[in-house]
């Protein structure tokens, strides 16, 4: 996928040292549901780390060829995009943004980029 999607938005391959950031993105996607449970912060943190680890291992097993990319805005990491290409299709595995970057069109730009790339090689996106 193109590493430059729109002004100020870019992608780069995720590295091992991105794990703390990727955890923060993941945890931010679970905050609303965790606000509903009667757990203290330590319990929530334990749960989030366990779930992040399970998701990471599950994605690695199910999609070993997937590209995990860090979404950048003005050079700063703001989210994660994971896409798995196969010979006959492209699977949009996951897209997640930090809360302050949601609902401003960034996700739309990213999904459109995935769709455009798939169309350019004649593959459907699922």
Model-assigned labels for residue ranges:
Residues 89, 118-126:
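Conserved GNAT acetyl-CoA-binding A-motif
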Residues 10-24, 30-36:
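A short beta-loop-alpha structural element at the N-terminal edge
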């Amino acid at each position: 996928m193109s590493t430059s999607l729109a002004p100020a938005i870019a992608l780069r391959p995720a590295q091992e040292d991105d794990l703390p950031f990727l955890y923060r993105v993941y945890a931010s996607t679970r905050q609303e549901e965790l606000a509903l449970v009667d757990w203290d912060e330590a319990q929530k943190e334990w749960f989030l780390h366990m779930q992040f680890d399970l998701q990471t291992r599950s994605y690695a097993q199910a999609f070993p060829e997937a590209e995990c990319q860090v979404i950048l805005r003005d050079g700063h990491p703001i989210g994660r995009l994971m896409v798995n290409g196969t010979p006959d299709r492209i699977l949009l595995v996951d897209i997640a943004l930090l809360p302050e970057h949601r609902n401003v069109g960034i996700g739309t730009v990213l999904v459109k980029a995935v769709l455009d790339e798939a169309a350019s090689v004649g593959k459907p996106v699922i």
